[in-house]
A protein has these predicted regions:
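Sec-dependent N-terminal signal peptides
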Residues: 5-21
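Soluble extramembrane regions of membrane proteins in the secretory/endomembrane system
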Residues: 22-177
Length: 177
């Protein structure tokens, strides 16, 4: 199974790269593990370097359970401000802060079995955050989705478990993240 996912990942990256001429420069950036305050500086440096070097596209390979909302918001702003087309490639998961980062990219591609969502804000002790914080995060996700012509409703539902999107339930009626 690992081999199949690895080959599929390489196929997707190869396909995206092939869309551009052979001489075009493609940046492949890994975002994995916990989203922390060191990551925005790295992403900003990579995006600036890609712009300086005339890259045609930046592919962000995402595999994270999330992390700090402030760091993810900074990364989102950097990606939205990029002059280069951006792609989120979700190899396994883009949970919570990872979902926000993915939504900031121009396009999202996922491997079979990958997941995105589960972005309900929580406090440092792991409990559900206040309605004020949830409202902020819901709007942050929604406006980010809208910026790239993605569904505001689906992005909002990733944050607010009270929201119901009928056509995104499994055959058994379970919520799909």
């Amino acid at each position: 199974m690992v081999n199949i996912i690895f080959n599929f990942k390489n196929t997707i990256i190869l396909f995206i790269s092939f869309i551009f001429a052979a001489e075009d420069l493609v940046y492949d950036v890994s975002i994995s593990g916990t989203i922390d305050m060191g990551l925005p500086h790295y992403i900003e440096r990579v995006v600036n370097q890609a712009e300086t070097n005339g890259a045609s596209i930046i592919i962000f390979e995402i595999d994270t359970f999330g992390g700090r909302v402030d760091a993810a918001t900074q990364i989102k702003d950097i990606i939205l401000d990029s002059k280069i087309p951006t792609v989120a490639f979700i190899n396994k998961r883009a949970i919570s802060a990872g979902a926000l980062i993915s939504l900031s990219c121009d396009s999202i591609y996922m491997t079979s079995g990958a997941s995105i969502g589960a972005a309900t804000a929580v406090s440092l002790d792991g409990k559900k955050a206040s309605e004020k914080v949830i409202s902020y995060m819901r709007e942050e996700m929604a406006t980010t989705a809208e910026a790239n012509n993605k569904s505001r409703e689906i992005a909002s539902a990733m944050v607010d478990e009270e929201l119901y999107i009928e056509y995104f339930l499994s055959a058994s009626g379970d919520t799909i993240t």
